[in-house]
Every structure is written in structure tokens, then in C-alpha cells.
Swiss-Prot record:
EC number from the UniProt entry: 1.3.7.2
Protein name in UniProt: 15,16-dihydrobiliverdin:ferredoxin oxidoreductase
Task of the protein: Catalyzes the two-electron reduction of biliverdin IX-alpha at the C15 methine bridge.
Catalysed reactions listed for this entry: 15,16-dihydrobiliverdin + oxidized 2[4Fe-4S]-[ferredoxin] = biliverdin IXalpha + reduced 2[4Fe-4S]-[ferredoxin] + 2 H(+)
Any one Gene Ontology molecular-function term assigned to this protein's record: 15,16-dihydrobiliverdin:ferredoxin oxidoreductase activity
Gene field: pebA
Species this protein is from: Prochlorococcus marinus (strain MIT 9215)
Length: 236
């Protein structure tokens, strides 16, 4: 499950003249002690994106997880693309959160880079779950148009691929239009990406999930050295 999303991203990254970055074997593929859960990771870089990572967690019929985060270069003020998709097989429930995660919460910045998410949401009513917005801090790294779905197998089979493709294609379209930086210079972009990693290191709900499956020692290393590598950077 979700392999088609991985393949879709790989194709798009390849078209961006991206290349896969070698990562530690313990992150590339890792099994828990009884081999019920397997996590696989990929890391890419391209001329426009300093880091684009993908994570797939295979828990068999019980749980499937897909995550991707794309960080633009420090000379681009665009939001960070972030997607979390979880399928709970036992309860047949889909949870998806897709967003262009803004570096700042200024209204004109949000309108320029994030508002087009609203058009995508209108096409898929199941992915417009405002009731769940309270679980995220809207004053930090989430846009007012964050796409949230708490759906079922119909949404998984019928809608997910289409909305994910629209979500990624629209983001790439914005980037390819070469928007001029209006709000942040290179130094501030870097600082805000560092702050994003520090915030995510503290708040990411997946941390508990990984600890329960793969243990605290491996998870701590994984979060610091693969997921949020700027967490240890010092801001002067």
C-alpha cells in the first residue's frame, strides 16, 4: 500500500533533475525485533530542493503509513511540503494531513503560497475536515487551508491518489513559476527552516509511534539524523 505514491514522487523528483542521496543502512530499511513492522526511507536532493524525504511504514493489515517532506533551498521562501497518510486496517479508517507548511504566518505570504490548497479541498469534501484542526497549532507551521481527511476505504481507493497528485503537482507548479522572494531573505529562510525542524522534533506525533514499534534508542537517532536534521543547529 502507498507504493504508488512513492513511485509518483520518485518520477517527479527525477523530472526535477533530482538524485537519491545515500543514507545509513539502519534507516534505509529497518525491522522491529519480531519483524511485524518494516520501515523504509528514501532521501533525495535536486537543484531546487535541498532535501526531499519519503518514509513508508509497513505494518501489514494492521497499519500502513506514508510520509513525505520537501524542503526548498535556503534561497527560496516557499513553504515546506508536508504529507502524513495513515491507514488503520482493523478499523478501516484513513487519516491524511496534507499542507504547504508556511515559514511565517503573514497573511499575504499565506495567500501567495498556500491559498490554492482551498481549490483542491473543494473538489474532495471528505478531505475538508475542519473538526480536526484543533489538533494542530494553526499559529505555527500549518496553513489555514491544511487538508485533513478522516475517511474510510472508499476515500482510500477512490480519492487519495487523485488528491495527492493534485497536491504535489500544484506545489511544483508554484515553485516552477519562480516566485520572487517578498517576505524573507536567505538568512531568515534558513532560520525558519531550522525552527521548523526544532518545532517538529518536539511536536511530531509519529515519535510515539516509532518508539512503540522500533524502540527509543533507534527512534531518537532516526528523528535526529534523518527526519529533522536541522534540530541540532544553533540559531544565532
Amino acid at each position: 500500500m502507498f507504493d504508488s505514491l512513492v513511485d509518483f514522487l520518485k518520477t517527479n523528483i527525477d523530472e526535477l533533475n533530482g538524485h537519491e542521496v545515500r543514507i545509513s543502512s539502519e534507516f534505509k530499511e529497518h525491522h522491529n525485533e519480531d519483524s511485524k513492522y518494516i520501515i523504509k526511507n528514501w532521501l533525495f536532493s535536486s537543484p531546487e530542493y535541498r532535501k526531499w524525504r519519503i518514509t513508508r511504514l509497513d505494518g501489514g493489515k494492521k497499519l500502513q503509513v506514508f510520509n513525505t517532506v520537501a524542503y526548498p533551498n535556503f534561497d527560496c521562501e516557499m513553504p515546506i511540503l508536508g504529507a502524513d497518510i495513515l491507514w488503520f486496517g482493523t478499523s478501516q479508517k484513513l487519516l491524511a494531513i496534507l499542507d504547504y507548511q508556511p515559514l511565517i504566518q503573514e497573511g499575504k505570504y499565506l495567500e501567495k503560497y498556500c491559498s490554492s490548497l482551498g481549490i483542491i479541498k473543494k473538489k474532495y469534501s471528505a478531505f475538508d475536515n475542519n473538526k480536526m484542526k484543533n489538533i494542530y497549532d494553526s499559529k505555527k507551521y500549518f496553513s489555514p487551508w491544511v487538508i485533513i481527511c478522516r475517511g474510510n476505504k472508499l476515500n482510500l481507493d477512490r480519492d487519495l491518489n487523485n488528491i495527492f497528485h493534485s497536491f504535489v503537482n500544484n506545489y511544483l507548479k508554484i515553485h516552477k513559476s519562480n516566485p520572487v522572494n517578498q517576505f524573507l531573505d536567505t538568512e531568515k529562510i534558513k532560520i525558519n527552516q531550522i525552527k521548523y525542524d526544532k518545532y517538529s522534533f518536539e511536536k511530531d506525533p509519529a515519535d510515539k509511534l516509532f518508539k512503540s514499534f522500533f524502540g527509543e534508542k533507534w527512534t531518537k537517532k532516526f528523528v535526529n539524523k534523518f527526519l529533522f536534521t536541522l534540530n541540532n543547529e544553533i540559531i544565532y
